[in-house]
Amino acid sequence: MAPPKKTVKKMDLTSFLNDDTFGSSWAEEDVDLNKITIPIETANANTIPLSELAHAKNNSNNTRSGGFGGSFGGRSRLDPALGGGSSDRREEYPVPDAPPYRAVINNIPWDITPEGVQAWVEDGLVKPEAVEEVVLPKNLRDPTRLKGNAFVTLKERADLVAVLKFNGTKLNERTVYVSVAAPRRGGGADVDWSSARGSNFQGDGREDAPDLDWGAARGSNFRGPRREREEVDIDWTAARGSNFQGSSRPPRREREEVDIDWSAARGSNFQGSSRPPRREREEPDIDWSAARGSNFQSSSRPPRREREEPDIDWSAARGSNFQSSSRPPRREREKEEPALDWGAARGAQFGKPQQTKNTYKDRSLTNKKTTDEQPKIQKSVYDVLRTEDDDEDEEAEKQNGDAKENKVDAAVEKLQDKTAQLTVEDGDNWEVVGKK
């Protein structure tokens, strides 16, 4: 079953704001501030004794300090609102009777220069060259900015007294305050500690800190700094026992090194270092040529002469049939076939039509064709790169080939002569073998 539809009533914004069905807005109700109460819990910790209030009042009237008084500059340690007025005032120093006569000018402009401060002081005194030195300390966190004060050293005491009258005057439309600078301690840097309370400046010669009443500042239960304890002379003999012997005995003497006879310790056959050191062996002069063989040639032979690089015409060497122009091309030698009388060598039956002989004849013709059809040796394109040594080797091979050919020709001629002397006669006791 479907849930029943909710009835929705539409109204405009004005009707909605003027609708008081559920009451008016809580923001329009008037609140009586006098009826608002704040509960305050009373405890012993929040109760301030009257005697302590009177003591804090007296300290606020009688104590002067440069930042921290007997009770935080005249305020109560429990509630600062119960104390008197603030006593954070700069300490005033008297005019010194001996140099240096230094004055401090506070709240100077940020864009002032030492020359500007010197001119301002001398113009006020109407006395040129009255200023001896001007120092403008810079901010440690930002060295590009000044710290806000200047230390002016004057040559005469009367000028310092006159400069103090410039207090509260204008310097570049800015009110400045002039006072006697604190005396230097140990030749340290010029630091205005009253204006540098919140800085992290650490000078070389820091001024002595004022004697502050830290006990009143930290509470009644605060204990001051511990004093250094004196070293107690303890009787260690009683602590160590009745049989302990003090340090009255003389110190131990150093033991002398014993000269040990290591030869006896190492054995009866040990020989010490008394024998002379071994002499170095001389290297024998070995005849390496005899050791390497009878055919070895030493390096005393003259160096090989450098070969002259031939002037190669590479443009002419691009073709396959390139022939060097330095010498005529070598002609191919044709082998001379000896004229043999094969008829006399083969017998009386030579020339008859026989199948076997025809077969051998065809084979001999084939071998002859093969010999005739052997490819001729062609010169390579790189034949031009051959050097003189290659030519010499080629000439030697050529001579060896000619000698071998001459030997073959002589053997063939000898065989021909012997073959020519053969005769096939019936009376020569030749046996004819026929087919079976």
From Swiss-Prot:
InterPro entries membership: Nucleotide-bd_a/b_plait_sf, RBD_domain_sf, RRM_dom
Modified residues (Phosphoserine): S65, S71
Effect of A150 to Y/F/N/L: Loss of function
A Gene Ontology cellular-component term: nucleolus
Keyword annotations from UniProtKB, A to Z: Initiation factor, Phosphoprotein, Protein biosynthesis, Repeat, RNA-binding
Sequence repeat residue numbers: 190-210, 211-232, 233-258, 259-284, 285-310, 311-340, 341-350
Gene Ontology biological process terms, A to Z: cytoplasmic translation; eukaryotic translation initiation factor 4F complex assembly; formation of translation preinitiation complex; translational initiation
Highest taxon of the lineage: Eukaryota
UniProt function note: Involved in translation initiation. May be the homolog of mammalian eIF4B and be part of an RNA helicase. STM1/TIF3 is a non-essential gene.
Protein name, as recorded: Eukaryotic translation initiation factor 4B
Organism field: Saccharomyces cerevisiae (strain ATCC 204508 / S288c)
